[in-house]
Amino acid sequence: MASPRSSGQPGPPPPPPPPPARLLLLLLLPLLLPLAPGAWGWARGAPRPPPSSPPLSIMGLMPLTKEVAKGSIGRGVLPAVELAIEQIRNESLLRPYFLDLRLYDTECDNAKGLKAFYDAIKYGPNHLMVFGGVCPSVTSIIAESLQGWNLVQLSFAATTPVLADKKKYPYFFRTVPSDNAVNPAILKLLKHYQWKRVGTLTQDVQRFSEVRNDLTGVLYGEDIEISDTESFSNDPCTSVKKLKGNDVRIILGQFDQNMAAKVFCCAYEENMYGSKYQWIIPGWYEPSWWEQVHTEANSSRCLRKNLLAAMEGYIGVDFEPLSSKQIKTISGKTPQQYEREYNNKRSGVGPSKFHGYAYDGIWVIAKTLQRAMETLHASSRHQRIQDFNYTDHTLGRIILNAMNETNFFGVTGQVVFRNGERMGTIKFTQFQDSREVKVGEYNAVADTLEIINDTIRFQGSEPPKDKTIILEQLRKISLPLYSILSALTILGMIMASAFLFFNIKNRNQKLIKMSSPYMNNLIILGGMLSYASIFLFGLDGSFVSEKTFETLCTVRTWILTVGYTTAFGAMFAKTWRVHAIFKNVKMKKKIIKDQKLLVIVGGMLLIDLCILICWQAVDPLRRTVEKYSMEPDPAGRDISIRPLLEHCENTHMTIWLGIVYAYKGLLMLFGCFLAWETRNVSIPALNDSKYIGMSVYNVGIMCIIGAAVSFLTRDQPNVQFCIVALVIIFCSTITLCLVFVPKLITLRTNPDAATQNRRFQFTQNQKKEDSKTSTSVTSVNQASTSRLEGLQSENHRLRMKITELDKDLEEVTMQLQDTPEKTTYIKQNHYQELNDILNLGNFTESTDGGKAILKNHLDQNPQLQWNTTEPSRTCKDPIEDINSPEHIQRRLSLQLPILHHAYLPSIGGVDASCVSPCVSPTASPRHRHVPPSFRVMVSGL
């Protein structure tokens, strides 16, 4: 029921459509021709104008049927359209013309939409403009062909961003903001709360992907970081988990309301809600949309209360359906007055949130046509606007330019176009207590954001942070811990000083002298240096400056290294001396002076100094700061703590530590080996050999434990310092106590213990040597126990033979005295045994004077070897008279006591210092049964 043309004559045939739409129209042409026109005629409820008023026809394309979901949009905006047409006619804005809106149902179907458009072109009047376009697919197809028909289209509900392409849709305008129009508003909101790090979560749908892509460009130009971009098709949980893994706190979501329920259920499972997170999602969902989808959410094991808990506080962004300003619009009414009239007008028809944009759209068309008529009137062409046809490029361009000049205040706010896009108002709503509350709005024209006072509500005391706030915190040594360990260290140093005083004061006591007091002093010195290093290890950035800390890196390394080498080297040297004497296979008297031990310790220190000097010269230690993984704030604040730890390191730290550990490790292993070899030495003259061995074990074990644990706890300075300090304290304290406490107890309970041992007597010459040399000990290794037992058994056997020979010699002497004329017959086997006894002097290599005299005498008189003497032989010349019984008796009476006296000391008999060779052996205090322990000769220290 289209109104007749103003000219009353058929117009020229329409021009062919542009190439993109021509093919589709040709395909549908056989179907379109038999059908009747689909115009709905006048807008329902609008009064007919007087017959004398020429109409200005407008093509209305929108879904109207109830069978289509979006048909409610078309039906919902018609009351607003009727109100606008009435008000325009009443104001005589287009006099003498009137608006003739002819409605065509597109049914949100591409084919039916094209058919409606073709019917309007073929059967209807010449339409000046196209009003409508709701469904994106239908709208985009028609809008692409408008330039060929010189028609300008104005949509009130098509928000798809693809229509913003002016190269493809140059004649398309819309009063409703595009979906992309929310991006500048989001940018403004991010800046308002100083959120500079966000993440995006997008449903794999073209509409949302386009918004996301545009948002990325907007944020990129404003230096806002998009730390993570996630998309999903059906299951958003994986994407939500990735966002959490990347520490995304501000999430910009683009998804429909059905997926929104799944997203928030996943957010609840991942604990991505509450005071630490802020979700920003589309605000165009249906009212109470969560009530409609919670059943589906429950099917995914997400209860309604869980969904609401995760949704609490989200911010929705959408265009403002009506302006909230109390300002009169172009119609002379405020938005609130219009809304009341609209509600009265719709009379049972469901409302549409686009009704305000449809209302302003009619006013845009009226104002555009008014400006176009003014332009035609001012031109010299004398053309009337009702003379428009689809081939009139000039009038089409005039209408297009008039659309771009639109600028007025409507019920939806300021109406102005920029490249065909509405610069409208964007509102922000927040989900609070199961309802959406408006909290602010963004004016695109003025580029201003207005937050309504006290309406926006965050779940924390402040807006969420855009990322985890990282508080770099230097891990320091605890002051109480440092104080306690320092106090223990001071006590240890006082104890070491007391031991040093004790050692110096009693250095002339034989008990102390036999334990090498000079080496003991070195042990004390090394212990005190080790104690001193504890103070330096506890000084970090909380006590000293960075430059001082770097200096301490070198100083404490040197002090600990030198202290360790001094103490352990002295113990090592003393253990080596015991081992060297104890392993003396030749049974020689062995003298190892303290000077030689000092050389050993000095050599170890020299090696240390060479390593340390090269280390310092080539690759010195520097202060480095190591960053560790973030830790939650113990106070529960929305921050994470990144521990920083100071280290003393250099470029080739591993190599230098390897050299030092290899050298010290080999030395320690060798020391432990020597201590193990001499573990059974228990000789009073070596009064601290066993304790020195125990000290070596102590140092070795504690150092290994300390080095291993210090590496494992390098990220915990308090634990590391505590372990290192305790290892040094225990190691030094136990060592000093093992070395000095037994001596202290012995001197206190038995001051003469060193001189009362009857198993060790010193000669006069050895006593003189005590002031110059150290103890020389002859001993046997435990590994040679069988050999020792054999020698002891042989010693006992020979002593028994001596006793038997004594008796035989006494009998011979008595016989010689009774028969001086006769030659006494001595049994050859007795001579042989006695001769063997004489030869034992060579085995012992003793320096006794009596044995040397006897040996020389026998060498000069080989005839005295009794095993070769024949008793029946008689003297035939003066030379042979020396073997006469008188000579034999005289020699035996003088030489046998000397022989007896000289031999006994070598097997545990009389003291070698006995001045009278004629004294009976039984008179000597040493002429007694030898206990089953090996006897040694000891020279004084």
Curated annotation (Swiss-Prot):
Q: Where is this region: Disordered?
A: 763-790
Q: Which PROSITE patterns match?
A: G_PROTEIN_RECEP_F3_3, G_PROTEIN_RECEP_F3_4
Residues modified by glycosylation: N90, N298, N389, N404, N453
Residue positions, PTM Phosphoserine = S776, S779, S884, S893, S913, S916, S920, S924
Where is this chain's protein located in or outside the cell? Cell membrane; Postsynaptic cell membrane
Does this UniProt record's set of keywords contain Cell membrane?
A: yes
The residues forming a coiled coil are 781-819
Q: PTM Phosphothreonine: at which residues?
A: T819
The keyword Glycoprotein is assigned to this record:
yes
Read off the Pfam families from this record: 7tm_3 (PF00003), ANF_receptor (PF01094), GBR2_CC (PF18455)
Per the record, membrane topology reads: Multi-pass membrane protein
Which effect does the record note for changing S695I? In DEE59; full signaling activity in the absence of GABA agonist; when injected into Xenopus tadpoles, causes abnormal swimming patterns and increased frequencies of seizure-like behavior compared to wild-type-injected animals; no effect on cell surface expression
Q: Which GO terms describe its cellular component?
A: cytoplasm; G protein-coupled GABA receptor complex; G protein-coupled receptor heterodimeric complex; GABA receptor complex; neuron projection; plasma membrane; postsynaptic membrane
Give the UniProt record's GO annotations in the biological process aspect: adenylate cyclase-inhibiting G protein-coupled receptor signaling pathway; chemical synaptic transmission; G protein-coupled receptor signaling pathway; gamma-aminobutyric acid signaling pathway; negative regulation of adenylate cyclase activity; neuron-glial cell signaling; synaptic transmission, GABAergic
- Annotated InterPro entries: ANF_lig-bd_rcpt (IPR001828), GBR2_CC (IPR041689), GPCR3_GABA-B (IPR002455), GPCR_3 (IPR000337), GPCR_3_C (IPR017978), GPCR_3_CS (IPR017979), GPCR_3_GABA_rcpt_B2 (IPR002457), Peripla_BP_I (IPR028082)
**Main function:** Component of a heterodimeric G-protein coupled receptor for GABA, formed by GABBR1 and GABBR2. Within the heterodimeric GABA receptor, only GABBR1 seems to bind agonists, while GABBR2 mediates coupling to G proteins. Ligand binding causes a conformation change that triggers signaling via guanine nucleotide-binding proteins (G proteins) and modulates the activity of down-stream effectors, such as adenylate cyclase.
Q: What is known of its domains?
A: Alpha-helical parts of the C-terminal intracellular region mediate heterodimeric interaction with GABBR1.
Q: Which family does this protein fall into?
A: Belongs to the G-protein coupled receptor 3 family. GABA-B receptor subfamily.
Its quaternary structure? Heterodimer of GABBR1 and GABBR2. Homodimers may form, but are inactive. Interacts (via C-terminus) with ATF4 (via leucine zipper domain).
What disease is this chain connected with? Neurodevelopmental disorder with poor language and loss of hand skills: An autosomal dominant disorder characterized by psychomotor developmental stagnation or regression. NDPLHS manifest in the first years of life as loss of purposeful hand movements, loss of language, and intellectual disability.
What is the protein's given name?
Gamma-aminobutyric acid type B receptor subunit 2
Q: Which organism is it from?
A: Homo sapiens
